[in-house]
C-alpha cells in the first residue's frame, strides 16, 4: 500500500479485443485489496455480466461528449462507429495503486502525465483463438474492423514494459501479480533510499 509520500503506480493494461484484460484485472482486484480500478467511460452497451460503475461507466454518446466538454474525460478514442472509450481525469484513491485498461494511444498520454506508469500488454494465445473470442462477443460484420484494431494494438506491443501471453488465465494472473510485486518493490526501495540520503544530508 502507498502512503501520502510515496507516489502511487498506475498499471496500464492493453491488448486486442478478446485478450482477457477484464478477466485478469478482476482477478487482481479480487486478490489484492490495495489495488483500485480506474473505471473508464464507454458508449457501447454492457456485455453479459458487466456491471456499471465497475467494469465501465456506461453512458450515451451525448453524455460522453458532454463529459469531454466539461474536462472530466482526460483522453478518449472512437474505436468502432459510435463506440467511444474515455478515461477520467481523476485517477487515484489515496493510498492505493491503480489499474486501468487503455489502448496504446491512451497509454502514451498517461505516460506523459504520470511518472509512475507501468504498461502491460496482454497477448491472446493464438490468432485463431483471438478470432473465436471476437466472434463470441460481436457480430460477424464487425470481425474485420476488430481484427484490424487488434493488428494495430499488436504492432505497438514491443514498446510496453511487459508482454504477457494469456494462454491460461490462472497462470497469466500469477505472472501479472508478480509484475505488480516487483514494481512495488522497485518503487518502495527507491523511496527508502531517497529517505536515507535526505536523513544523511540533514545530519551533516
Regions found by a protein language model. Give the residues of each.
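ATP-binding Walker
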Residues: 19
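Post-Walker A helix-loop "phosphate-sensing" segment adjacent to the P-loop in P-loop NTPases
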Residues: 30-38
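Conserved phosphate-donor/acceptor-positioning beta-strand/loop module used by diverse small-molecule
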Residues: 99-103, 112-134, 165-168
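ATP-dependent small-molecule kinase phosphotransfer cores
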Residues: 42-98, 104-108
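P-loop (Walker A) phosphate-binding loop of NTP-binding proteins
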Residues: 14-16
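Walker A/P-loop
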Residues: 22
Amino acid at each position: 500500500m502507498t502512503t501520502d509520500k510515496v507516489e502511487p503506480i498506475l498499471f496500464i493494461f492493453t491488448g486486442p479485443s478478446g485478450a482477457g484484460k477484464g478477466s485478469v484485472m478482476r482477478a487482481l482486484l479480487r486478490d489484492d485489496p490495495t489495488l483500485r480500478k480506474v473505471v473508464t467511460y464507454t458508449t457501447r452497451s454492457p456485455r453479459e455480466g458487466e456491471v456499471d460503475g465497475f467494469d465501465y461507466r456506461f453512458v450515451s454518446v451525448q453524455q460522453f461528449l458532454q463529459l469531454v466538454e466539461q474536462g472530466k474525460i482526460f483522453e478518449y478514442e472512437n474505436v468502432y462507429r459510435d463506440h467511444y472509450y474515455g478515461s477520467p481525469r481523476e485517477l487515484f484513491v489515496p493510498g492505493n495503486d491503480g489499474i486501468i485498461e487503455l489502448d496504446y494511444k491512451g497509454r502514451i498520454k498517461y505516460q506523459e502525465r504520470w511518472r509512475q506508469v507501468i504498461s502491460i500488454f496482454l497477448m491472446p494465445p493464438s490468432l485463431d483463438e483471438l478470432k473465436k473470442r471476437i466472434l463470441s462477443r460481436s457480430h460477424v460484420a464487425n470481425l474485420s474492423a476488430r481484427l484490424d484494431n487488434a493488428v494495430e494494438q499488436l504492432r505497438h506491443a514491443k514498446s510496453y514494459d511487459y508482454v504477457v501471453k494469456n494462454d491460461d488465465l490462472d497462470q497469466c494472473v500469477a505472472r501479472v501479480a508478480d509484475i505488480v510485486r516487483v514494481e512495488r518493490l522497485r518503487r518502495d526501495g527507491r523511496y527508502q533510499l531517497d529517505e536515507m540520503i535526505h536523513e544523511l544530508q540533514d545530519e551533516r
